[in-house]
Amino acid sequence: MSDIAVTISVLSLVAVLGLWIGHWKIRGVGLGIGGVLFGGIIISHFANQYGLKLDEHTLHFVQEFGLILFVYTIGIQVGPGFFSSLRESGLKLNVLGGLIVVLGALLVVIIHQVTEIPLDAILGIYSGAVTNTPSLGAGQQILNELGMQDITETMGMSYAMAYPFGICGILLTMWLIRLFFKINIDKEAENFDRETGKDKETIRKANIRITNANFAGLNLRDIPGFEKNGIVCTRLKREQDIFIPQADTQLQVGDILHFLGDPKILHEMELILGESIQVEASAMKGNLRTERVVVTNEKILSKKIRTLAFHQQYGVMISRLNRSGVELIPTANTTLQFGDVLHIIGSADVMDKVIEMFGNAQSKLNQVQMLPVFIGIGLGVLLGSIPFSIPGIPVPLKLGLAGGPLVVALILARVGTIGKLYWFMPPSANLALREIGIVLFLSVVGFKSGGNFVHTLINGNGLEWMFYGIFITFVPLLITGIIARIYAKLNYLSICGLVAGSMTDPPALAFANSLKENCGASALAYATVYPLVMFLRIISPQLLAILLWRAV
């Protein structure tokens, strides 16, 4: 067999063993994908004993390409929610998530300054302690740019030493906070449901009858506040006639308007127009038909709703738009993206033509457009290769293969569509590419780390590294958890989601969800902080490397 064939075969064995180890669970908690790292360490230990050498060039390519795939697909996954998570609605949770990252980084600086732990080792400990593999890749990239050599083995070993307690430490923090504050899970779930009850309906329906005679003869657009984003009138009932009103439709006393939109604006409409009444849904249907349509027609991507003119041509209206799980009230200036789910209302006679205009090809949602994938990867690698100088740093720095693809993926996922190119990726395809990437990366890192792993653990600094990893895992989580409970007044289940999300750890989220399966508090908090924290976890080791390199 050729060297390349031997290398690929051994890495495949590493992946099989590692994934098998990752499926082992103790009380529902396992290593997950991190098992691949330990599979690599085990195989490498025996390969070293028998003198088996793998092709270095192949190992290097597999490691870097796996990292690129993983980081890029992470960016595509979290991109749509990354920028929205920075908005005010999730400000409190994101500040607390950022605090966990900052506290961990400060501990790294302190430990490095008061001990003799090498820079590559402390960055590996940091990545393992926070159970974040992209952080490990980013740290390796920046140290290479700074001129450090032969760092993969040390970083991989220190990462592996800290990783196991990184997982256990999250669960231990949840348990200690629960014990310290004497938490009643059922009561916390009830409190969450009660507190969020008012906010569950971001879009509400209302039937309002016009009793204010001042609006008789005025156009629909003349209603104060009607032009505000966040409200739409989808039907007008006048005696026995039901139709979709235009902006210039003249109003009459007794008209019943069916609105969708922001509850606050709807309340204003009630005060201005007349009274809110209960009307059976069938009574407001008439000859109108409602359909749920998916945008898949490449000809209308990136176009504004007003330019399609379907409202004027067919009398059809879009009442709601769902994009990446977020429900919106569209305006005439809303730009359509691939995968947008539209709720449209119109005459049954023309509905089929309108559906054809939007595409509604459900099968396309399961297809991956490969051209945008490689365009994004190429642009990411290009961006990561552009050097920039920072005063005091001896060499120009780069975002590298971890930072470049991540930044580009975040931007492209947020943009969504450029011409006929769209960066929508089916969740199953994204997960497959992401898992392949991380398995490739961890297989090589584990194999390169395994030769001296046992010796380092028994005779070297392994136990010391493990202790510092426990410190970096536990202290930031516990401090932030207490602050979140006492000062931020967060629900305990939300704190569990915050803790899991700040460590970007799905097994921890699964554990948090199992505390109260019918309550979505943990999942909501996890999803809120995940995009920003993932970005900070990848950027933080690079900033730490620059800071500590300057201090050397």
UniProtKB/Swiss-Prot annotation:
Topological category with respect to the lipid bilayer: Multi-pass membrane protein
Gene3D superfamilies assigned to the protein according to its UniProt record, in alphabetical order: Regulator of K+ conductance, C-terminal domain (3.30.70.1450)
Tagged with keyword Lipoprotein: no
Domain of life assignment: Bacteria
Keyword Cell membrane: yes
A UniProt-annotated Pfam family: Asp-Al_Ex
InterPro entries according to UniProt: AAE_transporter (IPR050144), RCK_C (IPR006037), RCK_C_sf (IPR036721), Transpt_YidE_put (IPR023018), YidE_YbjL (IPR006512)
UniProt keyword annotations, A-Z: Cell membrane, Membrane, Repeat, Transmembrane, Transmembrane helix, Transport
One cellular-component annotation, GO: plasma membrane
Annotated S-S bridges: none
Gene Ontology MF terms in the entry: monoatomic cation transmembrane transporter activity
Similarity annotation: Belongs to the AAE transporter (TC 2.A.81) family. YidE subfamily.
PANTHER family registered for this protein in UniProt: K(+)_H(+) ANTIPORTER SUBUNIT KHTT, TRANSPORT PROTEIN YIDE-RELATED
NCBIfam families recorded: PRK03818.1, YidE_YbjL_dupl
Protein name: Putative transport protein Asuc_0023
Organism: Actinobacillus succinogenes (strain ATCC 55618 / DSM 22257 / CCUG 43843 / 130Z)
